[in-house]
Regions:
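Short beta-strand segments
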Residues: 18-56, 86-87
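C-terminal edge-of-domain segments
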Residues: 2, 87, 93-166
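Short, surface-exposed beta-edge/turn micro-motifs
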Residues: 20-23, 70-73, 138
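Short, structured patches in soluble enzyme cores that scaffold and shape functional sites
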Residues: 27, 55, 77-79, 144-147
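A generic local secondary-structure boundary/capping motif
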Residues: 13-14, 64, 128-133
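Short, structured beta-strand-loop surface elements
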Residues: 59-109
Length: 166
């Protein structure tokens, strides 16, 4: 039976997810074959009740097909300097139209990710090439978070994050 209280991430996790960390998405299709694609930013709506990630339609073709079939999506947010990582899962994912401010969110994400990786020796042109996608190719995938996990390497990896708690 579904919970009467929707799952909510705490404000620290919401800030972390939108702060220039590495974002990767995954799904699976009819035969449970996985698909994966790097995301180009994240928007958190309605105090974390809805999450939108931005992908290249061309690069994410398999993942978008799988989301259309299964509606399942897992998103991993990882800070490269510290390896702090969280995973968010949802079962109602769908491709959505970009909102007017979404390209600006993607542009800000690219700049923040450059700043995150520069101290590790990655050049701005390299990071921008990694995140290259014309605005016309951007798509959004929105979902409701149902579960979240600590995926930081170590003894606590895989443990559930408590809804609404740090």
């Amino acid at each position: 039976m579904p919970s009467a209280t929707p799952f909510r991430l705490d404000p620290d996790h919401l800030r972390f997810m939108t702060d220039g960390v590495s974002i990767n998405t995954a799904s699976s299709g009819a035969q449970d074959l996985p698909s994966q694609c790097r995301a180009f930013g994240c928007r958190v709506d309605d105090a974390g009740r809805r999450i939108r990630v931005f992908l290249s339609g061309a690069q994410a073709a398999d993942l978008l097909r799988d989301v259309g079939q299964s509606r399942a999506l897992a998103v991993v947010f990882s800070d490269p300097p510290t390896h702090r990582t969280i995973q968010i899962k949802g079962r109602d994912a769908r491709v959505e139209r970009l909102a007017p401010g979404d390209p600006a969110v993607v542009a800000a994400y690219r700049t923040a990710f450059v700043a995150c990786l520069r101290p590790l020796g990655f050049t701005e042109p390299m990071v921008r090439a990694l995140l290259d996608c014309p605005d016309a190719d951007l798509v959004a995938v929105g979902f409701t978070p149902e579960a979240a996990f600590n995926q930081t390497p170590g003894a606590q990896a895989g443990t559930p994050l408590q809804a609404g708690a740090k």
